[in-house]
Swiss-Prot record:
Cross-referenced InterPro entries: FlgD, FlgD/Vpr_Ig-like, FLgD_Tudor
One Pfam family from the record: FlgD
Record lineage: Bacteria, Pseudomonadati, Pseudomonadota, Gammaproteobacteria, Enterobacterales
Name this protein carries in UniProt: Basal-body rod modification protein FlgD
Function (record text): Required for flagellar hook formation. May act as a scaffolding protein.
Annotated gene: flgD
Family classification: Belongs to the FlgD family.
Length: 226
């Protein structure tokens, strides 16, 4: 009858367990490295108006192998949360000098220059009626458009009133009524503005300085113009 070497058996079990632990740790590290590489690529190509959120990052990280432990996971989340904020701030800063569309029923007109603005339709419209009025409520411009699809549409006002006179530099009000057949549909007026500067913070949505238009948060930007 053969004999069993207990010490050898124990040593073999220890070696096997250590090998499995190394493999598991290696797999966990590989998963993390792959995840982090994909995350960095996603951050570089993300939409600055809809950046990846810390909560999304945490959810994705929680699904990878946890062999490295919760403490290490939390540390990783903290590090990459900071990287996300830094990357977002860099991308948002690139908006400086660009024109954007934001929700506003007021447009800022400069005399002698065409004024761009827009509307956002929730659904298709068969008829859109637009009126621009001055601060006294006097109608100075009327425009009628047929058959517009849902989405954002850029429009232009030549800056003249109904008598073809150039209007002075100031703010004007825009009223829009959109209908699909006889049913009125929701519509949002959009004002164009130039991004002058950005105020960033790790705890709040970046603040966009639009000069005479005022300030808005990044999430309010509906369209970035070239």
């Amino acid at each position: 009858m053969g004999t069993v070497n207990i010490n050898s058996s124990i040593n073999n079990n220890i070696i096997e367990n250590n090998t499995n632990n190394v493999k598991n740790n290696s797999n966990a590290l590989d998963l993390q490295k792959n995840f982090l590489s994909l995350l960095m690529a996603q951050m570089k190509n993300q939409d600055p108006t809809d950046p990846i959120k810390n909560s999304e990052l945490t959810s994705q990280l929680a699904q990878i192998n946890t062999a490295t432990g919760i403490e290490r996971l939390n540390s990783t989340v903290g590090i990459f949360s900071n990287k996300i904020n830094q990357s977002q701030n860099i991308q948002v800063s690139s908006l400086i000098g660009h024109h954007v569309m934001i929700p506003s029923s007021q447009i800022v007109h400069t005399k002698g220059i065409e004024t761009k603005y827009g509307i956002e339709l929730i659904s298709d419209a068969t008829a859109v009626n637009i009126q621009i009025t001055d601060k006294n409520g006097k109608i100075i411009h009327i425009q009628k458009i047929k058959n517009l699809k849902s989405g954002i549409h850029s429009l232009t006002w030549d800056g003249q009133n109904l008598d073809k006179e150039d209007m002075k530099t100031e703010k004007y009000n825009v009223t829009v009524i959109a209908k699909n057949q006889n049913r009125e549909i929701p519509v949002q007026v959009l004002s164009e503005a130039l991004v002058n500067s950005i105020i960033t913070s790790s705890s709040i949505d970046p603040i966009i300085d639009l000069g005479t238009v005022g300030t808005v948060t990044l999430s309010k930007i509906r369209k970035i113009l070239k």
